[in-house]
Regions:
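Conserved beta-strand signature within the Rossmann-like core of class I S-adenosyl-L-methionine
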Residues: 138-146
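Conserved class I S-adenosyl-L-methionine
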Residues: 1-42
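Core SAM-dependent methyltransferase catalytic element
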Residues: 194-214
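Short "lid" loop at the C-terminus of a central beta-strand within the Rossmann-like core
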Residues: 118-119, 145-153, 192
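Class I SAM-dependent methyltransferase SAM/SAH-binding core
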Residues: 46-48, 54-101
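A short, conserved alpha-helix within the catalytic core of class I
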Residues: 119-131
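Short alpha-helix
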Residues: 162-181, 185-187
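A short acidic, Gly/Pro-enriched loop at the edge of an enzyme's catalytic core
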Residues: 100-111
């Protein structure tokens, strides 16, 4: 059953990314890029961009010195990520993989950054904390996602409360007993105006989290 769900998700995202246009544009997520720009890429660094779709965040990060890696469900997303990387004369490693099935190397990444990584809560509660164990000591986790109050708004995001983020709930998961020891650099629920193609456009309610592993 889990494999069937992955296949269905992959087919959906392959269709979403099938146009020559980039579904969410070619520019990195604004808030993610602002936070990551404040972190100096260490020598021989590794940066992971989960669910980065067509690779806009990972490609941007590669242009400022990060060794970017992506995993996502879509083979079409992988192909478009590599095209975007070629445009910017950088390289990005991209695995077609699923959060719940992926094996994460321990203490390997200096940065994990994601935008709009919405998964069912039963998967998120187990596997997002598990992913954090792949951060090195001092490594950063940066994310932006739609808040539960996004439901009535028409600026993007899933129309399921289970897929949206409640700040207290997700923060409890990311800093709880299943996660490594993390400390909070920034957390917020805020209103913002999105302009990431027609799919993410207009006034939106978002959760923003920046953590660092002890």
């Amino acid at each position: 059953m889990a494999d069937d769900k992955v296949k269905t998700g992959a087919e959906m995202w392959d269709q979403r990314f099938s146009s020559e246009e980039y579904a969410y544009g070619k520019e990195a997520n604004v808030w993610l890029s602002e936070r990551v720009s404040q972190i100096n890429p260490p020598p021989n660094n590794r940066a992971l961009f989960p669910a980065d779709g067509e690779g806009r965040n990972a490609v941007w990060a590669a242009t400022i010195g990060w060794n970017s890696e992506v995993f996502d469900l879509s083979i079409v997303g992988k192909q478009k990520c590599h095209l975007l990387a070629q445009e910017h004369a950088v390289s990005v490693d991209y695995d077609v993989d699923d959060l719940a099935l992926r094996e994460f190397p321990q203490r390997s990444y200096d940065l994990i950054a994601c935008s709009w990584f919405h998964t069912p809560s039963e998967i998120r509660k187990v596997h997002m904390p598990r992913m954090l164990h792949s951060l090195k000591s001092g490594g950063h986790f940066v994310m932006e996602g739609y808040h539960t109050s996004q439901m009535p708004l028409q600026s993007g995001g899933p129309k399921s409360l289970d897929l949206l983020f409640d700040l207290d709930e997700v923060l409890g998961e990311l800093t709880g007993e299943k996660a490594p020891q993390m400390h909070i650099i920034h957390i917020a629920v805020t209103s913002t105006v999105l302009d990431e193609s027609e799919l993410h456009k207009g006034q939106a309610m978002v959760v923003r989290i920046h953590l660092q592993r002890d």
